[in-house]
Regions:
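Secondary-structure junction motif
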Residues: 193-214, 279-288, 294-298
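A late-sequence structural motif
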Residues: 108, 257-299
Length: 299
């Protein structure tokens, strides 16, 4: 059925609503003769009158009532189809703006973006890698659509979409003395050089809270706001470093070891947006993808 034909069907619907060909023509911004002609053409095509013509207007016949019900169903289907087409147009183009913790920047987020762009190659991404405080600030300022951060600070109008409990893990060279163990205690790391994330980062803050309640003292040889630098220190200077498990990627030279839950409690990695905000279609769809992946990672 052509869109032009659907427009002519709307003439019948409008006449039925108005109860008058003249009033319907005024609503449609066409002449009464044009409306009457289209109605008569349809009646001839159907082989039955749609309206009873009366002195003070028109009234639907039984056939007309059936036909108008069909028209309205068709009109609803067309509107849904047009809405879906607009969604697809938005889905296939646009920009997803997201702020994330550093732990997500090396492997997890690039992998998920690549998977999304394999389906929608015209969608672009604007990724901000920040500590959790700054990430939430950019969300509050409408500079990004989504955040994916570890231990997000309180924001009154923040709407979590998905959260995943994360443990802190230790990164070390494959030939480190502790690498032979499947799980370590923080006390095992005492006496070995360590490189830590700076104090603005969520993982470091969690570790600092634990150390403040203990008598453990680490030999801290380097601190940085760059996880890439810390990873380089692990490989080049044989130190131990710490981060959340989702961002800890092993290699032939670098291994990841769990830290006993008795030492460091798990905390939440949270995907979220501003409450009540209608996201651009690409951002909403990407959020759905991330939520599915995070859900699948639950133990």
């Amino acid at each position: 059925m052509s869109m032009r034909h659907l427009r002519f069907l709307r003439y019948v619907d409008e006449v039925a609503r108005a109860g008058s060909i003249r009033k319907a023509a005024e609503q449609l911004h066409v002449t009464a003769s044009a409306v009457n002609r289209r109605v008569m053409d349809l009646e001839e095509e159907l082989g039955a009158p749609l309206f009873e013509r009366r002195a003070r207007g028109v009234r639907l016949t039984a056939a007309g009532e059936l036909f108008v019900r069909y028209i309205r169903e068709q009109s609803g289907d067309v509107e849904r189809m047009k809405s879906q087409i607009e969604d697809l147009k938005g889905l296939r183009r646009g920009t997803v703006r997201i702020a994330c913790s550093q732990a997500l920047a090396l492997d997890f987020l690039p992998r998920e973006i690549a998977a999304y762009r394999a389906k929608f190659p015209l969608v672009q991404f604007d990724v901000k890698v920040f500590d959790h405080e700054r990430a939430m600030s950019t969300l509050a300022a409408y500079e990004v659509d989504l955040v994916l951060v570890f231990r997000p600070p309180f924001l009154p109008n923040f709407q979590p979409l998905m959260s995943l409990r994360q443990r802190l893990v230790a990164l070390m060279p494959a030939d480190h003395p502790l690498a032979a163990r499947s799980k370590i205690r923080l006390s095992d790391c005492v006496g070995y050089p360590v490189a830590l994330a700076e104090r603005s980062l969520g993982g470091r803050q969690l570790l600092a809270e634990v150390l403040a309640r203990s008598n453990l003292r680490f030999d801290i040889v380097a601190e940085s706001n760059s996880f890439e630098f810390l990873r380089g220190m692990v490989l080049r200077d044989k130190v131990i470093s710490f981060q959340i498990e989702i961002g800890a990627v092993e290699s032939d030279e670098l291994v990841v070891r769990q830290i006993d839950d008795r030492d460091v409690p798990r905390a939440d990695l949270v995907l979220g947006q501003l409450r009540g905000r209608s996201l651009p279609v690409p951002a909403a769809k990407f959020a759905e993808q991330l939520a599915r992946v995070l859900e699948a990672m639950r133990p």
